[in-house]
């Protein structure tokens, strides 16, 4: 029981989860989400009497997409690269997706009948993302924040990316976003700009290379463009590796055979 509450201000906060349909409206103009409070306004009632409502409180929400293109280091698009998306650096909390008409859509776990990352199984419709004949993987319905894109299988003949790619989606909203009034219109003005970055770490020919990229974005469509490059895997191993030792021994053996044959001919 609270004492001396008369005249005090009460602040209520709420959280909501977007359903799968949010993936259909990435970028501007965004969409309205509304909430209001129903309360008892009958002092003589224990909650079963007359009720009233607060005015609607409205927030403009946005979702985003990542347009991925898989290529080799000569800009040839690659089919058959497999990816999974995670919300943590250790790649334990997967962001599940399902196949849609225009790409891979983030799944609302409740509506899909699955469970979250608490030891249960993945949602019913969850799939692994695979680059098509055009090399594309379109990922739709993301919230702002940081994600890790992990390649789980490289195209045939190419090296698998050793580390996941860290992707950040960074929107900038108007300062008075929380003062939006339901039905006000001009929801697109709420999103001022959209930025996205990618940190890519690769290991090739014995050297580690790290790159921080500023991705091309379009706030109207709510998308960021990311090119993921695979290099051919059949390169001579670095000095000191077991594979090189085998090659050197084999090469020396071939030379010995060649010398023996030459001596026999003499």
Model-inferred region functions:
Residues 1-266:
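Solvent-exposed loop/turn and edge beta-strand elements of beta-rich ligand-binding domains
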